Amino acid sequence: MPEAAVKYQPYPQIVLPDRTWPSKAITEAPIWCSVDLRDGNQALVDPMGHDRKARMFHLLLDMGFKEIEIGFPSASQTDYDFARWCVEEGNVSEDVSLQVLVQCRPELIARTFEALEGAHRPIVHFYNSTSELQRRVVFGKDVAGIKQIATDAAKMITDMAAKAGGGYRFEYSPESFTGTELEVALEICNAVIEIVRPTADNKLIINLPSTVEMATPNIYADQIEWMCRNLDNRENLIVSLHPHNDRGTGIAATELGLMAGADRVEGTLFGNGERTGNVDVVTLALNMFTQGVDPKLDCSDIERIKEVYEYSNQMVIPERHPYVGELVYTAFSGSHQDAINKGMKAIKQANKPTWEVPYLPIDPRDVGRSYEAIIRINSQSGKGGIAYILQEDYGINLPRNLQIEFREEVQRITDEEGKELPSKRIHQRFIESYVEQPGARIKFVDHHTYPAGEHKGLRVVAAEITDGGETRQIEGKGTGPIDGFINALSIYLGIELSVADYSEHSLQHGSNAAAIAYVEVEYPGGKLFGVGINTNIVAASLEAIVSAANRVLDVVGK
């Protein structure tokens, strides 16, 4: 790489020692304007045809956008025709303003008004580039010449609007604002404001675009606060942000710009746009939502938003994209899974509406996602994640020691295969290892109990089992079926077995609900779990003991 200090110059700092934005917070949603159908569309390899545009347009209306930039009708017949369709057939309610873009050229402005005929309070958005670089390299004009372009356009647009009977709104953008000296941007904007003469009933939108993101977000915030302080007739202006994402900080720049006094944001769904994209309004809205602020945009069906985005733009959303990517609500790490598992249990038990789950800043259900993909299992996963999947998907609530034991078995599989284990496979392995145990030596068949005669309080458990497929009758004594049955198995197998831990719960609800029993059996070499499932809880418990005994036999080699 070349020497950075020689080839690139740092962006100048803004002198604003009394800046106030760092102590501000976002407490209400801005005015949102979608520019998907203009800025977004112009950045596509294959620009949208009518059907793709119409589908995007209806989604934006359904989401609650009140301002939608529908195109550049003076630039192409396609955009002109779509603008007429929106006006005539778009079913646009009167609280929604259609916005169109136009350069500061007389013939383009005239065509723009033709495209908007019949629209309710549309926004005519005119712009010209004001940056020092473009003045010098592209236009060869001084500040006065660039200002003249803007003021001539402002005069023509306001005159044409008056001749058309009024009802128009106006927006002016000093394009490449972040590359323009603040004093120059202010001079040009104030000249436009003087011509448009905005009022409380018809405010002028002054859009301050980060056409190319050139510096850190705090500098953009300083620029916005400085402009908000110095613009003429500020009370009758709507200061708008239009950030891009060249440095990867478009979201942060927008949030700081709102803290600095801006009222409005132009952006696109999931940040589609030229180069690295426009600011992502979905992420912005959901960032506000997770801070307790109503974003005034409906993102409750994020899968539909994603589907329309991918259809209309012919682009795929990355798996890690905030709030919408396939993996953003998923944990593979063992420690993360354990924390999520405990957090989900805690929130179920807590009697309050506040969302508090580690590693999940938003409840996936709030955007139409389920809990199914929160935890997925691979070689990095831990006992908490495995326990969560079995609990959520199958109602199996593993005791802690069984979580540890079964995790080792799952770990062996993931290490061998080197890939993710789906929920169904984990459940299948659990049932095979602990319940069905194909090929196991001992199987439980039946049992009955009767008093132990001279031993008051004890009962004899007479049980039928199979050993290698052959029927055997065994007997043992104990205070109940579990105690007596493990005594019988100990005698029969010649291994001292005892119950170290026992728990059970129902798997379903109702009179025919199956019960699942977990029994941890201690033997001279350690402890192992067994699991039984049966509609009879006693039978489930005895099956669990047999399950554990078979695992002991595997270990001791009998």
UniProtKB/Swiss-Prot annotation:
Molecular functions per Gene Ontology: 2-isopropylmalate synthase activity; acetyl-CoA C-acetyltransferase activity; magnesium ion binding
GO biological process: L-leucine biosynthetic process
Alphabetical list of InterPro entries matching this protein: 2-isopropylmalate_synth_dimer, AIPM/Hcit_synth_CS, Aldolase_TIM, IPM_Synthase, LeuA-like_post-cat, LeuA_allosteric_dom_sf, LeuA_N_DRE-TIM, PYR_CT
Location of region: Regulatory domain: 437-558
Subunit structure: Homodimer.
Function noted in UniProt: Catalyzes the condensation of the acetyl group of acetyl-CoA with 3-methyl-2-oxobutanoate (2-ketoisovalerate) to form 3-carboxy-3-hydroxy-4-methylpentanoate (2-isopropylmalate).
Protein name as annotated: 2-isopropylmalate synthase
